[in-house]
């Protein structure tokens, strides 16, 4: 049977035809006197005295180097404290070396240890070589590491990809909410950071199923390990009055506001048990809610939920702390136990209360085939949010047995109000989830069972001056699957069979009661094959599923294959190719058979249609890393083509927007290039990086031009104008620099350059928008005092004739001792109070004007117990 499977699989994985093992130079390095193996010995291949390749010995003293050279070369074997050995070699062979210990006489010699060490799939950073006295928390050090970046939301990325696991001493105490560590753990408490690629978190699957996951592990200083680290912060300040514009263009001035900032947290991080407790509160624009967000990628335990009403977002291409008028309180508790490096129990709970206000005005321009419609609105908006979560996770992670059960309960309520729009929107979500996994390893086979269950209750309402719409959603979801796996001679076969079902009920209260169901049932089978041959690896997934929608009396057969090929010639290079085909049907909001409102002037109507999409995706990825040179580079070229059986139609009038589904075959295409470059310079204490994004997005939009009522059911496109084709091109570059030439000075620079233009139909070309943001942060240190100066310059186009220049300047003075940290800060020195920006989307342009935080003064005092 194995022979038949290989004959079927190998033609598909054509690149695997090269199955011969590459020749290699390998051997063992030991101590001449003791015979003990030596770790971290540098094995260098030299040509005319120049190093062309290298490897390090592992903990057992072994090394291996792919041999792809012709002619006579030299192999140098060196380790500090031992005499260097040089051998001539002309072909791959097994070369064992015994090193003689040697005393070292140092005279006016400076030994410079490496800051980064790489071995196989692990990169280790010595944080002492990157940290400075100006770094407060561990996030301040992590962002200095070549190859590592932290985005505005606090998410840690390695070579442009978000990490999948965040450990401290091998334990995930926050369950992915690692901002609670990044924003609170002292930079001095961490000794080193490890990045582990191709990380397989389940020991029972190691060596059987490959993984593309990335894990970050922090190793603490021995003096900080298992010790309680307790911090407290108190702060107060004053905010200047804001300038507000009403709907009649009259201007008034608010009085000043008293500011506060309070925080208390306690951390105990060790190898057997860990705890993190914290409370924070402020109204100075700092977004504390991010500390409760799960930032790691864990798609296997995410069950999507879709609501009918969505609260308006408070966002702009501006640092969030400048536009967020908030009152926030957040509380979290985390406790984790670990026994025998295998069994663990994690307990978590958290709560956030957030009240956000914003005043803004919007101008939306809709470009239709025969007309252009402009809609303006100016309003005050208040959003109150309360969110809680509670989690219990038990795991028994052995090589022959794996058991995991994770229970999670979450609730979130939102109330958004605008008096000018006479609109109040309430959205809530209450969920209870349980994820169970069991794996058993036999002599030849591996058995696995997984179960996922979720109950969700989503009440929501939209209150207007003349009516109230109310939705009540219930959903019970269950997915059970079992799999059988075997690996033999580098060839893995896994067969998974499961049953997935959802009971979904929706009630809509408006002028009358309307109900509908979106329940479904789906058995599925998913064969998976993986082949490893030397430098090559490939996998083929062939999932097949049947899905039945009971209320709609519709059935679908989905076949969603995917192919993955990877070539890794050596430690430095990695190339992979990915292709997939995915067919899916609409979610519960697409299946709604009646018309409903989403805000005070917008309606949505599906006309009872059943949207089905087919997506093709192709990715080509390449990366290069050189830890000795502190250089990391990646590039991704991707193409996505999605075919739809329905097309979105928009009908725009002076006081109403209607989005309807119409039967019309169409497609969208997205082509994009992503690239990241990161380079460290040891001698200059400098890190530079560049992120590049280039994309083209094309699609179709249908616009109603007849006088018929847009809310009248109409499944054909007759009577409407022809579909408009749109194209949007976008370029974005982000150069960054962090430079610490001396203990007394540090500089940080971050620029964002974006350029985007849109074409609608054959005649409408929207002027390209150029947005240029520069951020500079300088720190000067004299003894216990730091002086920080920050500047931000925003230059952005509003239209073809108008652009806006906005300059922000901040300053702070910090006094610090071993226990105390006192800071006086002045933000927005020039007292800028308004900001505006323009964006393009499909067949419309959107210009927004909003109030921003005025000049503010804050004084905070922090103490570490």
Briefly describe each language-model feature range.
Residues 28, 32, 60-62, 83, ...:
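Membrane-proximal, glycine/serine-rich, low-complexity loop/turn segments characteristic
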Residues 33-47:
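Short, ordered, surface-exposed loop/turn motifs in non-cytosolic proteins
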Residues 46-50, 72-87, 863:
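A short, solvent-exposed loop/turn motif at the edges and junctions
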Residues 49-62:
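Short, acidic Ser/Thr/Gly-rich low-complexity loop/linker segments typical of extracellular
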Residues 89, 206-207, 244-248, 279, ...:
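Outer-membrane beta-barrel translocator domains and adjoining extracellular loop/strand segments
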Residues 332, 336-354, 382-552, 568, ...:
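Face-selective signature of the C-terminal outer-membrane beta-barrel domain
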Residues 732-753, 763-865:
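Conserved C-terminal beta-signal and adjacent last beta-strands/turns
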